[in-house]
Amino acid sequence: MKKILLTILAISLFGCGENKPSQEQKDKADRYVQSLVDADIGIYKGELTDANFLILAVDAYSGANFDAYARTYLEEAQTKGLEIKGVYIVDIKDCQFGDGWVSGDRIGKAFK
């Protein structure tokens, strides 16, 4: 019985593994974000998080439906080959970017 429980525990621990994005996915995300920044459409920065969410920073203004923007960018990112769980939109004035993380209130969101 102990062997069975130990085996199940080991499978659970090793089977769950890390779900961090691959280097290929990070590179695709970087290219996609750079294309959005270069398009001069109000996106100033972006990051693919370790949890596999794409975070885009915009200059937020009242009355905008940022959930709709997030849905649009999620669909577009998926057509570009990104395998992400979703897209979050943050206000560029109230966020911080790090390597694989972003802090700040999510003002728009869309999920796969």
Where are these regions (language model features)?
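C-terminal motif of bacterial Sec signal peptides marking the signal peptidase cleavage site
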Residues: 12-15
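Sec-dependent N-terminal signal peptides
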Residues: 7-8
